[in-house]
């Protein structure tokens, strides 16, 4: 049994510890782990992680990356490898935290390539079989010697498939996170049983548009690269591309997936003959990705609330998502939520300037807004068919005392399309954390 390093990111608060699993179910044919190699300055925080496929050397992989024009070196290198290999034969991920290796010029590209080279060598992979990710401070070169020295140590002594190995891996990719984000799930397709495991990091600089958030999930289901890429893109659009903490899109946003087929069964592809199995897997991965993405919002820097923006009866999914995003990214709305202020005018303002597809996408006279408590108690109407309600401020205050809240907007267009978006409030603590980030 390889060694594991028990380490908590910080002293976990009662709130944070609720979201860290005490056990999990893990897919066959993988080994993971994390160690401290010296990127982080405190001398102990885990900052290097590896995930390895141990079932043959021909796993399928897929990736969705940031559209920020200042793409970090590891993003560029991983995209290139995925494209060159058409998603086939990717067998490991290597990740460092504490330094983003972004806007680091030619040296940054060489460092990312060297991380791939050394990882492939120590894991006895074919050339360019690893994807590389980095997260942390932008604009500084990696302490590459420490990372390249840590990779062999991690690979030879600290990889395994126990729950603690997965917790170490999840911890090692964190920066300002207050808890490691890990989700596992077992599901069936027909007579075959498969497992998903996923982890991600993120608490600030979160407003992804992957057409300093990292995530990866793996399964032992047999899936072709093209099917996995399509499913991942669909799932990310409805999960990681539907969250926001602060409206800032990172240079390093990356979500990758791997499927090694270790659990056997019929290969899942995107042909019509496999439509039922494909659809079932897609539904499982969408639900799984949403669970992971919501953990990022729950760990939003300084956040005290987890808010679901639910837009219903839109003309199109695009309209519904755009309106939900507009509200979720509104600093005025988010600060009102922190202040427990039922200022629904800020919600209407954000609806009104959302980027929608037609003049009929939003009709004020048909628009309704309400607060929906998650405890099943009575909702609170704020606006009904464009007419303001006499708001019970005491009831509003009661609802806003809760950590979780649903803000539901019904556009009344008879289009029948809906979208959810997840956000948090914006607090004084967010400013403190980010003002002190590099100190």
From Swiss-Prot:
The record marks 135-136 as: Involved in the stabilization of negative charge on the oxyanion by the formation of the oxyanion hole. Pathway: Amino-acid biosynthesis; L-arginine biosynthesis; L-ornithine and N-acetyl-L-glutamate from L-glutamate and N(2)-acetyl-L-ornithine (cyclic): step 1/1; Amino-acid biosynthesis; L-arginine biosynthesis; N(2)-acetyl-L-ornithine from L-glutamate: step 1/4. The active site is at residue 212. GO terms for biological process: L-arginine biosynthetic process; ornithine biosynthetic process. One of its GO terms (molecular function) is L-glutamate N-acetyltransferase activity. It catalyses: N(2)-acetyl-L-ornithine + L-glutamate = N-acetyl-L-glutamate + L-ornithine; L-glutamate + acetyl-CoA = N-acetyl-L-glutamate + CoA + H(+). Its EC number is 2.3.1.35, 2.3.1.1. Pfam families: ArgJ. SUPFAM superfamilies: DmpA/ArgJ-like (SSF56266). The record marks 211-212 as: Cleavage. It is an enzyme of class 2 (transferase). Heterodimer of an alpha and a beta chain. Catalyzes two activities which are involved in the cyclic version of arginine biosynthesis: the synthesis of acetylglutamate from glutamate and acetyl-CoA, and of ornithine by transacetylation between acetylornithine and glutamate. HAMAP family: ArgJ. This is Arginine biosynthesis bifunctional protein ArgJ, mitochondrial. It comes from Candida albicans (strain SC5314 / ATCC MYA-2876) (Yeast). The gene is ECM42.
